[in-house]
């Protein structure tokens, strides 16, 4: 019999995009107001406002992928450095490094974006 995980994995990409689609917001270090909109078609819009740099604003658009079911990889076309978030639950994601490491427990709350 086919394992439930394999069946789920086969379906996961489309489901995951629908599941994570939405707009997330938070203030990330160091004082960067961050709004990330993930669309069900696999595109994203990331807006960052740098409070410490006279509210300088940066907008990035691109495509994202689901890796391992709960890691979002945002392809960053201009710098070539991808941005990674991990899905924590239905309403929040957390910024992680390219190795999949989450921030340590003491300051992880500073790296969370919550669904708006």
Region spans (language model):
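Short, conserved beta-turn/loop elements at beta-strand boundaries and strand-helix junctions
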Residues: 68-71
């Amino acid at each position: 019999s086919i394992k439930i995980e394999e069946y789920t994995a086969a379906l996961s990409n489309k489901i995951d995009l629908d599941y994570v689609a939405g707009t997330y917001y938070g203030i990330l270090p160091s004082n960067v107001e961050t709004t990330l909109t993930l669309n069900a078609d696999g595109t994203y819009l990331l807006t960052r406002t740098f409070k410490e740099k006279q509210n300088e604003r940066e907008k990035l658009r691109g495509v994202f992928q689901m890796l391992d079911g709960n890691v979002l990889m945002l392809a960053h076309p201009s710098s070539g450095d991808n941005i990674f978030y991990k899905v924590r639950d239905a309403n929040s994601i957390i910024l992680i490094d390219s190795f999949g490491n989450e921030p340590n427990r003491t300051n992880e709350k500073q790296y969370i974006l919550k669904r708006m």
